[in-house]
């Protein structure tokens, strides 16, 4: 067979391909598979990228400042000195504020270059395996007071969705006002609306429903706005908490100022105590100067240094963001230490992995990667800048032998003394080619189309570009069938391979095996009585007979040929070291059908069985097995008849559905058209008012107009109608009588309370004055004895009344 030269690009080689397998043919006769070496493939090297992500927190801070001294707490003579000190503090605060404000403005403009990413664009970007969070923040200070109590923390767990349920009075689906269709008066209303071109109750109800739908939408938007307001409140609370935390960073500076102020107050008290002594006053002034120099000046210096650090940090972020937007990694954002940490991680942990075997870094110097462009991606959220760098890893080339896979059917009784025909087996779904390294640690499969796409033979090697996939590592839990057969792993073959069975044998054939110059011979179903071996150069036995064998390997002497009914082997002239005139010799090598053996051998014994185990000129003992028979039932005609029947039923059903849908659509269109028609053309189309009335009653009751009118003016209907009218008219009278009854009852209760209060007043006067008072209950009159004037409190109004009395 001609050797095809082959080159292929393989990615992610997991093993060293320095040693090349020199086997020309790998025989697995027990499975009917042969691997014929056709070429050597080479992966031309390649580059992969290792990604690493940093999450950089955008620095936030407050501008540091020093508080002024309260000069009112000092002696009046020290006020000029205190004012001078405050002027110095104000000057330092102003200078620090201006420099930091300008730096923050420059940084904000640089951040605007990187637009904020949407949340859905950043899914899992903070959860990657290589994510490293680097916090770059500046010291913070300030004199801001806390605006929230300690327990007034924002509730981060309150994620209850807003109540967007529409109230019942806005729900258009809860309109149950259709009961009014039962009121007889509605008939007259419909009659007049149809005749005099007026909107009917149905039209008004539709308008009400539309208004309810509009109200529901407005209500929903209102609730959504309320929910948005709650969310803004939560954001403000969170911001307030953050500002309180920043405030704590300036407490040290505030305490220093407080100490200075306390020292000055102490000095003032001491100065006042010895005010009478001028020399002592001068000493105290010098002490004040020393305290200002030793306490205030260092605080001002520290404030300026802190402001300068914040300004430097803002400038570093500004330059870093500009470089980032230009496509380069900036050392101001990703420092050399951070870059060195990633490089060390790749060298120690990534490259030793089998997936990255034989891959190397382009450079271990961090400065090399700061010069590379377009090797990163970035995004920005509200408080973070996310930077991902793709570090390239390159790999040198390696070589592996490439084998063409031949699969052929083999008899169940192959290599045994059983000559009965029990069928044939064949391995299914094998690829066209497989490349395996010398240590069988890595392999790759390819198709005939990929093999034919290769071109450009150079020293026995062809280039295939990207026609072949990435090599696969050897794994006992995940293996292809072709590789399992190649390494002759019996357990893996039973797990990953599919064996096909057929009771029809192949045609006789023969193929030379390049590994040992032997021939693989199959007699086929039509077995000859014998095969002829012809050795014309032999003077001892030029012609001999050989008993055929069903799939065996046969070695034939040099200069001899083999003839059969289905094939013929030409004389062998290669690899002959001895004279061609010697005694011809034929050797048969037998193998067993491993698919049949695995059915009768335990798993423990199966590990000791190899597909290439063979006997020379000796058959194996037969295996007791019955011929496999498969029974199938011919129900094709019945299934076809059912299919036709179901197909016809489906067509009928589809036509009926289409017809019903058309009728329904026409009815809906007709009803909608009538509902929208309020013009006097309705009467014109009917021809007369009588026809319009008839059409109205027909639409409402579904009957003839005269039958409906006769039913309305029948004695039964008129009697029922009169009863309903009487009940309606009786309701106001009942309501009036009920109101009168409640009014009289209320007046009677008022009169009883008045008489009771008068009795109590009379008893009090008896106890007070010893007078005899006589009442006449029916007329509320009294006979007065021995008393001229008396005072009574009105129980209703509460006013005092003077009453004259006689004996």
Curated annotation (Swiss-Prot):
<feature type="signal peptide">
    <location>
        <begin position="1"/>
        <end position="18"/>
    </location>
</feature>
<keyword id="KW-0472">Membrane</keyword>
<feature type="topological domain" description="Cytoplasmic">
    <location>
        <begin position="726"/>
        <end position="807"/>
    </location>
</feature>
<keyword id="KW-1043">Host membrane</keyword>
<feature type="glycosylation site" description="N-linked (GlcNAc...) asparagine; by host">
    <location>
        <position position="660"/>
    </location>
</feature>
<keyword id="KW-0812">Transmembrane</keyword>
<keyword id="KW-1133">Transmembrane helix</keyword>
<protein>
    <recommendedName>
        <fullName>Uncharacterized protein ORF54</fullName>
    </recommendedName>
</protein>
<keyword id="KW-0325">Glycoprotein</keyword>
<feature type="compositionally biased region" description="Polar residues">
    <location>
        <begin position="133"/>
        <end position="142"/>
    </location>
</feature>
<feature type="topological domain" description="Extracellular">
    <location>
        <begin position="19"/>
        <end position="704"/>
    </location>
</feature>
<feature type="region of interest" description="Disordered">
    <location>
        <begin position="133"/>
        <end position="171"/>
    </location>
</feature>
<feature type="glycosylation site" description="N-linked (GlcNAc...) asparagine; by host">
    <location>
        <position position="277"/>
    </location>
</feature>
<dbReference type="GO" id="GO:0033644">
    <property type="term" value="C:host cell membrane"/>
</dbReference>
<keyword id="KW-0732">Signal</keyword>
<dbReference type="GO" id="GO:0016020">
    <property type="term" value="C:membrane"/>
</dbReference>
<feature type="transmembrane region" description="Helical">
    <location>
        <begin position="705"/>
        <end position="725"/>
    </location>
</feature>
